[in-house]
């Protein structure tokens, strides 16, 4: 199971969502439902149907609010995967460019950002494994 890194999301769809819920002419809206086991959206008949504008939207994701790195920061691999498989910086540069452009536009739609910090990486790993076991 993977996690979608910047550059793998439908930013245009998310921007349309925020535009519609902020519109004074809001009527109704279909919101995609994502199936993590399939790593894709559910069929449209299973999407959520909003009949009223929500008072609050919780926009959740591991990379929400992530900032791009500087060119200097980008050159230093942060893990063995980057060190071994991205020596030419192709992947890191692509993700970073996404954060500088489309994702910046998306994150500017947010009124606030709440960050939950786990005590350690093993706890995150255990939460993820527990979640993924439920998918299968």
Language-model segment annotations:
Residues 10, 60, 111:
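Acidic active-site catalytic centers that drive phospho-/nucleotidyl reactions
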Residues 1-39:
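Conserved nucleotide-sensing/catalytic segment adjacent to the nucleotide-binding pocket
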Residues 26-28, 53-57, 112:
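Loop/turn-to-beta-strand initiation segments
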Residues 36-43, 93-99:
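Short gly/ser/thr-rich secondary-structure transition/capping motifs
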Residues 63-136:
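Conserved NTP phosphate-binding and transfer environment spanning the P-loop NTPase/kinase superfamily
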Residues 44-51:
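Glycine-rich phosphate/ribose-binding loops and adjacent secondary-structure elements
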Residues 57-63:
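Switch II (G3) loop of P-loop NTPases
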Residues 14, 58, 114:
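Conserved RecA-like P-loop NTPase ATPase core
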């Amino acid at each position: 199971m993977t996690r979608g890194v910047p550059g793998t999301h439908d930013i245009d769809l998310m921007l349309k969502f925020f535009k519609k819920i902020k519109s004074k002419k809001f009527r109704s809206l279909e919101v995609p439902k994502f199936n993590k086991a399939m790593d894709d959206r559910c069929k449209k008949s299973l999407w959520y149907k909003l009949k009223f504008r929500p008072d609050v939207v919780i926009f959740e994701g591991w990379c929400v609010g992530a900032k791009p790195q500087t060119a200097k920061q980008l050159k230093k691999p942060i893990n063995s995967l980057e060190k071994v498989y991205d020596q030419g910086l192709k992947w890191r540069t692509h993700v970073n460019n996404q954060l500088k452009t489309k994702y910046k536009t998306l994150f500017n739609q947010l009124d606030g950002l709440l960050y939950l910090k786990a005590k350690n990486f093993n706890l995150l790993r255990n939460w993820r494994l527990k979640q993924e076991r439920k998918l299968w």
